[in-house]
Amino acid sequence: MQTDYAELVRRTIRSVPDWPTPGVTFRDITPVLQDPRTFRVLIDLFVYRYMRQRLDLVAGVDARGFIVGAVLAHELNLGFVPVRKKSKLPYRTVAEEYSLEYGNAAVEMHTDSVRTGQRVLLVDDLIDTGGTMLAAIKLLQRLGANVVEAAAIIDLPYLGGSAQITATGTPLYTVCQYQEGD
């Protein structure tokens, strides 16, 4: 049954060819967010997976991870903490850099956003090369969190990110996958 629900989500995601550059197919979750039934199904897939786990917080990766992460935290009666792009948080922060195709980027969190030993679920919308998610995992661990699992709506396994994440020992859950050429 979960497969049917995941397939509904997958069918609702819009594929935009040649955006933002030629040869890239962008996976757009906004149709999922616009349709209350499908958005509810998406959130329920995550809720049913995590409702019996002993979690303390949900962390969401900037920016679309905020949408799903905050709603999921609310549904699970947990706190939510943002993992932001560099220079977006007003208080004391700690950062983790990661490599991009043409340079570096960084994610940040407030130094007081998690406590040592807290069990955290990390959420984002999509995993491609895995750089942002890996940096967020490292950042949470540096702050003392136990990253129970990383989760995303979409996995693009042919880009290698999901394999890199699981290679760290962090379990990974994704609602749907797209293979190259899908």
UniProtKB/Swiss-Prot annotation:
<dbReference type="Pfam" id="PF00156">
    <property type="entry name" value="Pribosyltran"/>
</dbReference>
<dbReference type="GO" id="GO:0002055">
    <property type="term" value="F:adenine binding"/>
</dbReference>
<dbReference type="InterPro" id="IPR000836">
    <property type="entry name" value="PRibTrfase_dom"/>
</dbReference>
<dbReference type="GO" id="GO:0006166">
    <property type="term" value="P:purine ribonucleoside salvage"/>
</dbReference>
<keyword id="KW-0808">Transferase</keyword>
<comment type="similarity">
    <text>Belongs to the purine/pyrimidine phosphoribosyltransferase family.</text>
</comment>
<comment type="function">
    <text>Catalyzes a salvage reaction resulting in the formation of AMP, that is energically less costly than de novo synthesis.</text>
</comment>
<dbReference type="GO" id="GO:0016208">
    <property type="term" value="F:AMP binding"/>
</dbReference>
<dbReference type="InterPro" id="IPR029057">
    <property type="entry name" value="PRTase-like"/>
</dbReference>
<dbReference type="GO" id="GO:0006168">
    <property type="term" value="P:adenine salvage"/>
</dbReference>
<dbReference type="GO" id="GO:0044209">
    <property type="term" value="P:AMP salvage"/>
</dbReference>
<protein>
    <recommendedName>
        <fullName>Adenine phosphoribosyltransferase</fullName>
        <ecNumber>2.4.2.7</ecNumber>
    </recommendedName>
</protein>
<comment type="pathway">
    <text>Purine metabolism; AMP biosynthesis via salvage pathway; AMP from adenine: step 1/1.</text>
</comment>
<dbReference type="InterPro" id="IPR005764">
    <property type="entry name" value="Ade_phspho_trans"/>
</dbReference>
<comment type="subunit">
    <text>Homodimer.</text>
</comment>
<keyword id="KW-0963">Cytoplasm</keyword>
<keyword id="KW-0328">Glycosyltransferase</keyword>
<dbReference type="InterPro" id="IPR050054">
    <property type="entry name" value="UPRTase/APRTase"/>
</dbReference>
<keyword id="KW-0660">Purine salvage</keyword>
<dbReference type="GO" id="GO:0003999">
    <property type="term" value="F:adenine phosphoribosyltransferase activity"/>
</dbReference>
<dbReference type="GO" id="GO:0005737">
    <property type="term" value="C:cytoplasm"/>
</dbReference>
